[in-house]
Amino acid sequence: MKFFFYADNLNPSQLKRRAPEHKFLFTAYLPDHSIQFCRWSTQWRCGLASVIPSPGEKVWGAVFEITDEDLKILDDFEGDVPQGAYRHLPVTVITEEGEKLLVTTHAANPIGKFKPKEHYIDWVLKGIKQWKLSEECTEQWKAYKPA
């Protein structure tokens, strides 16, 4: 299954635990979506990122091939939040070459608006660097850091 990862799931340490059989395919962005911190994490003690529809915006990430077992592990790792807090959804991403591709991603069922913390953003930025995402993506995430 081709799965679009973004935010903290791009961090290589986290990705290795949550989808151990993953294979990197390419970087891409999800058009007409933006990041919203709409779930609270007791582990991170801050808001967690999810994607929401947002015309004209984009969310950068990477597409990986993952197994059914990876998907089960990934879902189990979301145990920091109640069951059903996240859902899988089909989305069309655009590669750096402009190719459109239907993949799966996950999104939170929002419960409110929360703020991220610096340590969470730094964790995300490690993944952005690892997968060589765009400078636009890096700057977007740096802008989420608390002042």
Predicted regions and their residues:
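Glycine-aromatic micro-motifs
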Residues: 1-147
